Regions:
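Structural boundary micro-motifs
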Residues: 1-128
Length: 128
């Protein structure tokens, strides 16, 4: 894993941390319990059938949902997070707000393309 990919994965994991993250470690599905920064690197504490301490990001892959798996109900809910305002020319503009990105994180959608980069795995139905 190159430094750019490592940074992208760390940013993604940190933004999803409050919502719970299931990751693959070796051949096990485990949950991220804690993310720590020490001596210039990030370390993860993971729990499953046992607790794993000091795991480097290179050893894990989060389970994420492709945007294409969004249900019609989820799409409607997601649209409610958009912000709209009128500019000085009277044109109404709609954009993704912080709440939109937070919603995607909370629902474990892969909006950064991590699955295509082989940095994440596609979540199974009803995994989250």
């Amino acid at each position: 894993m190159n430094q750019s990919d490592k940074g992208l994965l760390l940013v993604d994991l940190c933004s999803r941390y409050p919502y719970g993250i299931i990751v693959r470690l070796d051949d096990k599905n485990v949950c991220v319990e804690e993310i720590k920064f020490s001596r210039g690197d990030y370390f993860f504490t993971l729990s499953g059938d046992k607790t794993y301490i000091g795991v480097l990001v290179e050893r894990i892959k989060p389970y994420l949902r492709p945007i294409s798996s969004m249900t019609p109900e989820e799409k409607e809910d997601f649209k409610k997070t958009f912000e709209t305002y009128e500019n000085t020319m009277g044109v109404e503009l709609t954009y993704l707000s912080y709440a939109s990105i937070d919603w995607l994180n909370a629902h474990h959608f892969d909006y950064r393309g991590l699955i295509n980069k082989d940095l994440a795995l596609e979540a199974l139905p009803n995994m989250y």
